[in-house]
């Protein structure tokens, strides 16, 4: 009880000291994003064939696994991936749904493994972002993507986590030679569902 009280008191003190800087930084980011929206091309992409492929993948996952939570996660992720591809926009409620489904899929015995999976999945992206910021003073990964990555990390095992993110980054770098601004979340959707399909088929 005393430890709990000390921990919460420490958190309250640290938050009171750091919150102004956090708020001002978020406010600055919101203003910058607003300016980008004002100058952004209003055309929204339409990809009907790709949409059909993306939205039928959860059906395949369910057919192979009979796991409704996994299939539901894939469906919500397909919505996120398509909206990011089409308009570079991710609805907030889909982020919450992804996290909720990912948390529901956890078992108590998997908590430590899930923590490592999230960490391994995030690490290559964080290193890539840090490299871009230090050398180019540029954001190479959209900040909104980091709201999606933990949910994906919770749905995979540690042995595949880092390699999946590395594949995501390599594919983005490869395809960006021909197509500008490849959305990383869309690529992550295909690698995640591809990995799940291979696992369910016994390929890996």
PLM region spans:
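A membrane-topology feature that recognizes alpha-helical transmembrane segments
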Residues: 1-204
């Amino acid at each position: 009880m005393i430890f709990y009280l000390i921990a919460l008191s420490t958190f309250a003190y640290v938050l009171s000291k750091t919150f102004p800087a956090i708020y001002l930084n978020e406010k600055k980011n919101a203003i910058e994003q607003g300016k980008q929206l004002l100058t952004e091309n209003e055309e929204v992409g339409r990809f009907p064939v790709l949409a059909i492929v993306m939205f039928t993948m959860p059906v395949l996952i369910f057919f192979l696994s009979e796991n409704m939570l996994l299939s539901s996660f894939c469906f919500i992720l397909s919505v996120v991936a398509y909206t990011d591809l089409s308009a570079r926009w991710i609805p907030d409620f889909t982020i919450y749904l992804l996290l909720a489904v990912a948390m529901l899929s956890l078992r108590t015995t998997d908590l430590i493994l899930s923590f490592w999976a999230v960490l391994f999945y995030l690490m290559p992206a964080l290193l890539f972002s840090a490299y871009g910021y230090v050398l180019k003073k540029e954001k190479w990964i959209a900040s909104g993507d980091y709201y999606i990555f933990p949910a994906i990390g919770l749905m995979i095992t540690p042995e595949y986590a880092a390699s999946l993110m590395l594949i995501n980054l390599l594919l983005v770098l490869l395809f960006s030679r021909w197509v500008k601004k490849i959305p990383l979340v869309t690529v992550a959707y295909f690698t995640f569902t591809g990995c799940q399909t291979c696992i369910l088929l016994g390929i890996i």
